[in-house]
């Protein structure tokens, strides 16, 4: 092959440095990919990655060292390894090494088994994929090769229904013109077929011998993750040919409806776009995780302080007192320095007191989160029967964060709406079609409409298509030229593929539901798109087959927001047909009659007001000479290696101008079931919902009213449409001024200051009286998100009850979410269903994917997924609230029980000469956290609930404590620590005081170290068991079994450890022989245990009774209400048993209940629950919740500190 002179010098070199291997060195990156067909020796110079994929992390040799290295990246594991090393030093260790190594090994083993299991399945999947077979052309012969042995530059033969082994350049196929059909479900989840086409120069290479002689070279972009873009050039026979994404078959696709095709491997293995897109999602941590890390550091500091205090005590005691005992006690070799003695004592006490930060905490947290995730996955009420799709928790680390959400960012299409498009109305030459009027000229409602239009004249019509305005069909039959041209455009300007399984049975495969709806409408009105080839489109126009020559497709993208086709009709006339967004197309029209533009614009506004999705249609005639010249420049732009897309966009911009307006379409996208009720319920839970959509303003606003985000009761809906920074700033400031002036008028006493600094914006949130909404367009949002305006935008938006951002790009969606995350101390959730929502989903604290019509990219990027928006209320108000409640109660109890356990050693230090002697038996220390107290707290953390799920939905105000971090924060932590320290004081000093004077039954002294240890340990286990019984709000059989079972296990192990049998076998290890039997046989000991338990528990019980009586929280009020209802129902049942009456009053009561049921079904009672609740919540938490919300806002910096206007319940 000869390289043309036009190739840049860097491409004309014979070779390139081997810096593009699978493991690319840090000093080199691949700037371009060169692949020559049938020349492995040449391609091996570049050391490209092989086609072997590896998603596994370990092998048999590396598993143990690598996994241990990864686990010791965790600070907690490293901390406990450090303690283990300390325990191996005899001079400072007062505990056996197994007290730390047993829990540590247990944790490491559990994690390692989990990692090994996950990696085993990755290995299994890798082997399954790598060992698939493909037909590869080697030395002129097709041979069966494993996928892992395929190399860049190889030519592969694919057959129907086979997976594509690597990223291939399509060379030829069994279909005419080098076409082939693929399914991309594994890439983007879309099951509709897509068409790919070989370039004409290679489409005739269908023979193996011809392909064996093919030596073309492809020079293209380096590996990247852009699924919809490819730019390259084929050099062959002294010519160059542009390549695009339409010529590529990507790994993971499946060949469909094509007998065979040949492709040239461009990217292999980890360089394929599928693997480039399988990178790890950013790891998300919850606010509780971050708080817990801070608290653990504080605890460690507290541990060091205790160690220092006891070390100083040891140094003083050794110097002042210790020498007196050396005369008659066995003593280690005297330490020369009291300071050194204190130093050794410090490390000894660090070892003993380390249980304030138990290693089992981290394992327990993960187990609880895993249980919560399974509850979400198993929830039948979040299972969609129609799609057979369950809810899925795709992560286990964010469950409790679901109970703290304050902002929801939602896509509209496919998320709030069904994304099932229906052709509803249209405007043609200034005439609107779609509405039906009665004899009096009034618009008929849906239930009053006549029969739909009869399309029986058209044997190819889609029987599922419904349209109500028969005048449009009459215009078609009458031969109206504008109407014919309108539907001709819809039948030609698209990328839909048709499939005809039987004669007359057409099936359309559209890349978007909008296109499918438009082509189906044209089909029913007599303009039937029948088939296409790369160069032609065949349409049956009112029964006559007409084939148009397809000259060019100017494809749609998010920037252009339009698509066009250029066709030549049988008479040789060239015409451009274009459809796109009104904001784009109306600026590119030939000045028509003012009347046509005005009427079409009015229709567009009317359609948008009805919540319909609109497109404008236009056309333009091209003369042959202009088209030839334009096509030549388009070819040059498509061959450009630099800025190819920008050059093509400029060429497209030129031809898509001075067009003639033809009309507009309006497509209906209905709301999903339950959306208004869900939004109303979440709003009552003080969750703010922002809709971020690409639709036009009128459509978005109408959907806002439909789903009850916007209401007629709102004080004002602000619309920001400025085109410059100054205009946007002025509109935002006017909105804030109106809100504040209104609040001042009702006596809030807030003074507005016109010049707000970006560093100290006056918080409007506390001053706003009334309900406001903000609607902002994409071009205005671009200015509002600039660095010097973002705070003003956020301040205004956060003061509003609802925010709708229209005409926004995927990047702007992510920027809005990032803005709220940056300045607001609030948890954000983003929910969407399409690829354009992925960036928003990944940016938010929590990402939720809807499995809908737009593929599964949003689901793959999400943390949670389900099939309908209405399930969001259950995810947050039930699973999220419960997960937060359970995790908070678990952490409070866990810190309490460990401080109660550990601090006893601290007090004992003052009575044992600061000798680092432990109170408990070393086996009790080892088993306390992993056997005696682990299962009860796990059961509470997994199963506990304060109110039933129905009440969580009925009283959304119950959600607020999570938003305010009321259940676990620094204050609650210190309360738990104080309770733990209080318990430890009583558990040490009560037995100590009793044992000082008590005697046994035989009159001998009761006090000895071993009896004291057994008494304190037994008291501890009983106290913490009673405490968790008080903390448990929802008792199950599992809770009973774990709590009482743990107590039974404790006594069983205690008596076993102190038995003669174990002492005889291991006399050096089990030295408490017979102690348990002797100690627990004494009535004084049981009285001491009972006294200790009562004194530890009674203050807690008293405090809770007082709080319940004087200051109950909302969940207490709801539980009380439920008890009252149950008693009333029981009384009614008793009354019915006493006697029956025939009074009409019972009939009236029954009919009244029927009416209330209709009210519930209508959704109008959404506020009723809150209002009804307020009747008995004067003693409840509404006031203190709101005061805490105000306190939170006052203590925070503006605007993050601004609290939202509380919703009155």
Curated annotation (Swiss-Prot):
Catalytic activity from the UniProt record: ATP + H2O + phospholipidSide 1 = ADP + phosphate + phospholipidSide 2; a 1,2-diacyl-sn-glycero-3-phosphocholine(out) + ATP + H2O = a 1,2-diacyl-sn-glycero-3-phosphocholine(in) + ADP + phosphate + H(+)
Coiled-coil annotated spans: none
Compartment(s) where it occurs, according to its Swiss-Prot or TrEMBL record: Cell membrane; Endoplasmic reticulum membrane
Membrane-spanning parts: 69-89, 92-112, 296-316, 339-359, 899-919, 923-943, 973-993, 1012-1032, 1037-1057, 1083-1103
Bilayer topology: Multi-pass membrane protein
Binding site for Mg(2+): 411, 413, 833, 837
One annotated GO molecular function: ATP binding
PANTHER family documented for this protein: PHOSPHOLIPID-TRANSPORTING ATPASE ID, PROBABLE PHOSPHOLIPID-TRANSPORTING ATPASE
Protein's name according to its UniProt entry: Phospholipid-transporting ATPase ID
Lineage per the UniProt record: Eukaryota, Metazoa, Chordata, Craniata, Vertebrata
Gene designation: Atp8b2
